Amino acid sequence: MEYIDQITNAAVNGESEEIKALLNKEPSLLNAFNSDGWTPLHLACYFGQVDSVKLLLSLGVDIHIKAENSNENMPLHAAVANKQIQAVDLLLTKGADVNAKQSGGGTSLHEASLLGDENMIKLLIEKGADIEIQKDDGKTPLEVAVENKQKSAVHLLTQYSNNKA
């Protein structure tokens, strides 16, 4: 097994000591991509391995690195997509761009709205997410929530929109 496969497996499983050992052998793995276009940080975020995320951040990983695949998403998008609120909070606290766009122009707030994840929507807005931001197709997070019949998200986003006005 190649080092990239070993470190991505360690990131998925939250094996921080293994991550450290592999990075000592091969420092370039910190921001390396696996065959699916993901970095160790993307995978640690997606699987909610907060201790591994903390370790990678402490070692200087690129918090804004885009996946080398059709999603072109950042670690923040990966964490939101799998409802990993602790990882999202950590990334935002460490400087991740809450309004960063992935392929198609979607932001983390668009993804949380699609999923109907109220707690994630609240966190993202509290951390500065733009509720009026549009995807490449012109849709706002509210329109995404409506389109996907996420009633609680529609209600919540409407409240935030009304409070903003």
Residue ranges and their predicted role:
Residues L29-L30, I63-I65, V98, I131:
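Ankyrin-repeat inter-repeat connecting loop/turn
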Residues N34, A67-N69, Q102, K135:
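Ankyrin repeat boundary/linker residues
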Residues Y3, G37, N71-E72, G105, ...:
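Start-of-repeat signature of ankyrin repeats
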Residues M1-N9, K94, K127, D136-K139, ...:
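Ankyrin-repeat-protein effector appendages
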Residues E18, D51-S52, Q86-A87, N119-M120, ...:
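Conserved ankyrin/ankyrin-like repeat signature
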